[in-house]
Each structure stands twice: as C-alpha cells, then as structure tokens.
A protein has these predicted regions:
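Bacterial N-terminal signal peptides
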Residues: 1-9
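Pepsin/retropepsin-fold aspartyl endopeptidases
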Residues: 11-283
C-alpha cells in the first residue's frame, strides 16, 4: 500500500483509451495479483495490481530502461515510513486492450513489494485503475475492464479521503462493521495488496474508534501486533466469517482506520464511475 502526495507540477491527468476484453493474472500467495503490462510500447513487464496504492510505481531499472523523463518529486507514505521519491512521466501504460496515457509514476526500489512478489517491475495503482470499472475474479484468475455492472448489492465507496489536513485522491474507502464487538462502522481501504484485515493505531483526528476494548481473546503477532481471531466482518449485507484481524502498532497512519483485503471475496466488481462495489457477484 502506497499513499502518494505529489509535491510539484507533476500531477498528470491520465488520458483514456476505450478498453475491452478480459485479462488473466497470476495469483501469488493466494492474494497478490500480478499482471503483465506494456509501458511506452515496451514489455510486457510484471506489475503488482494494488488498489491500496494511490499512484503507479516503477523501479529505477525500469525507469532507466524506458528513458522515462523525471518531472518532479512525490512524498511516498507506506505503512512503515515516509520518504521522498522522484516522479516520472509514462507516455502509455497498457494492460490487455486497456490503456491510459500521460501517467505519473513514482520511482522507488520497492524492496518490500519485491520480497512479496519477486520479479515485479512496478505497481499499478489507483491512478491507473480508477480510469476503468473492473471485475476481479480470484477463482478464475481473470480481470475484466469496463464490462457491465453485475447484479447484486451495490456498496458505496469513497474515492477521496483526508490525511494530515489534506485531501487524498485515488482511494477505495468502504464502510465495514466488526460484528463480534460494538463500535459501529469503520471506514477501511479496499486493498488488493493486503493479506489480512488490519486496523491502524488510533489517531487523534480519527472520527472512528477501534471496535475492540479487550472483549476478544487475541494472540501476539509479529512486531508486537495483536491478532484477533475468528472475527466476523459485515459490509452491506455481505458477511465474512472466521477471519483473523491484525491490530497494528505501526507508527504511520492513513486516511482510513485500516485495510480490508479484497481477496476475502471470491470476486468483486469495482465501479469507479458509479462509486460502488458489488461483492461476490453471480457469474
């Protein structure tokens, strides 16, 4: 998950070409989606598809290979730190028949990403994905661009949030409720790059409190985190049972209370144009 704040005139508006068709993807560790993309007519290159990343990211070697011009800098916020990176301009990024042009891309080594998905050369973020309505089918390992919306409950998503007093864009924020305890609905980021549901430390400016107040048994996780076992999450009328939820102690917080992994649904239709998702749509 990357949250990018562009600090120069490098904020580039993607120009859209009409996409059609299905694209197959590789599923790593049962949750990470890796697709093949061409960039500036070169490739294909392996990219991690990450709805939790606000911007597309490429590694320095790919930037050099593409001769991508640097157009500014961007502040890259991850769940562990904040750093400044260069931003390049990509003439075109294409997945299957779906393409966006004049896309800004952060240049970053992506060390943590490459540990989880060896061989990837970049991350396709929401600045690219938000140009399309997308169906992700984890069972069939296919994605469809700009197909008709399937039947099913439409759960509202917010594509803008707030972080450190600034408006964030290219987001997929959705309300979810943890049924095991009281606390009401929380706004979580729908994240294809997340393995487990995760709650961040409570911020002073957070409008939502964490649902757990010692009422659930938990075990100690990695890095001092707490893992709440056998939780039930409700999104709209969709219930997801028996999931483990990480309560993180990471120092960096975001515009959402936590992360909601997309893979916990067998499929999902994301309508960026309509501002809704359909969870587990019928075939």
């Amino acid at each position: 998950m990357f949250l990018v704040t562009v600090s120069s005139s490098a904020a580039l508006a993607a120009q859209i070409q009409q996409p059609k068709g299905l694209v197959s993807f590789d599923l790593r560790d049962k949750y990470l989606i890796v697709v093949e993309a061409t960039v500036n007519g070169m490739g294909p290159f392996s990219f991690l598809l990450d709805t939790g990343s606000t911007h597309t990211v490429i590694d320095p070697n790919l930037a050099r290979q593409l001769h991508a011009p640097v157009v500014g800098e961007a502040s890259l916020t991850t769940v562990s730190d904040v750093r400044m990176d260069k931003m390049a301009r990509l003439k075109e990024v294409r997945v299957g028949d779906s393409a966006a042009s004049e896309l800004g891309a952060v240049i970053d080594k992506m060390d943590q990403v490459k540990l989880k998905a060896p061989g990837v050369r970049g991350v396709l973020g929401e600045d690219f994905l938000s140009q399309f309505d997308i169906l992700l089918d984890y069972k069939k390992r296919i994605m469809r661009f700009d197909g008709a919306a399937p039947a099913g409950e439409r759960c509202r998503i917010e594509t803008m949030g707030h972080y450190r007093g600034l408006t964030t864009t290219n987001r997929l924020l959705i309300e979810a409720e943890f049924m095991d305890v009281s606390g009401g609905k929380l706004q979580l980021q729908l994240d294809t790059g997340a393995k487990m549901p995760e709650l961040f430390p409570v911020r002073n400016d957070s409008i939502s409190a964490h649902p757990w107040a010692g009422s659930m048994a938990f075990s100690s996780g990695l890095n001092g985190t707490s893992i709440h076992s056998h939780a039930t999450i409700r999104i709209g009328t969709t219930m997801v049972h028996d999931v483990d939820v990480v309560q993180s102690r990471r120092g960096v917080a975001f515009d959402a209370v936590g992360l909601l992994p997309v893979w916990i649904f067998k499929s999902i239709y994301i309508s960026h144009t309509g501002g809704f998702v359909v969870l587990n749509p019928a075939d």
